[in-house]
Amino acid sequence: MLRNNIKADFHIHSNWSDGSMGIPQLVRYAKALGLEAISITDHDTMAGQKEAIEEGKKHGIWIIPGAEVSAYNSETGRKVHILGFNVRDMDGLEQACRPFLLARHRKNLQSVDLIAAAGYPINQNDVVEYASLGGTVYRQHIMHALVDRGLSPGIYGPLYTKLFGSGGLAEIKAQYMNAEEAVQLILDCGGLAVLAHPFQYNSIDFIPRLAELGLSGIEYQHHTQTPEHQEEAIQAALHHRLFLTGGSDFHGFYSEKALPPGSTGTEFAQNHPLFDDFINF
């Protein structure tokens, strides 16, 4: 029986995108940490959601279906990530995001070629093995291959910056969906759109426009956000009548910060919109 306040994490990644852990392992881990509800929000895909829901039923943990759509602000050029929750038409969202996943995959394979040309002992086949389940190569998979070859002590650090930082030797600009289109896509697919970590990419000033289009919420609890950031997000939510979410942005071994699920201390009332809108698929 769920308490009035539910310990939840609405932002977790699996190995369907750029997380290192499989969905069964993630669900068991979240349960062991005392979480009662989670959302696995892989980048631009909902491929693992049905498995997650079944695992949740097995282990007594509430699964809120979700995805994190990678997008950009067409006026500023800055990245904007939009979380989509309780998406009814999962196939529709999957099909709309598929071209961008393929573009990401091709871009990162080109990065592998640039890295190999610079003298690093990796190739495309090596890296693809790390992208096992989802099939899309991410920068974390490239770095994992380099870590396993003893060329970097971890995923993030000087080598990551050298390769993928601004002006890095393997930096290739990604192709993203317009953020306004991302919000509309989530709505068209029957979901709720939430602006992810608005201070990580300086997208807080984009809230008024996205709210006009049907944005439902703001992720105010995230490891990149200070108490001052959180207060600003709360005020924006009050002004635009949006709800608040939070999550660890956990990626397992691929996490930029070693923060486990639930580490943001997120507890939500049982009548929170994500629970209230929940559809038992």
Language-model segments: residues:
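Conserved, well-ordered active-site substructure
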Residues: L259-Q270
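Short acidic/His/Gly/Ser-rich catalytic and metal-binding motifs that mark active-site loops
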Residues: I155, S255-K257
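Extended substrate/RNA-proximal surfaces in nucleic-acid metabolism proteins
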Residues: K57-P208, F268-F281
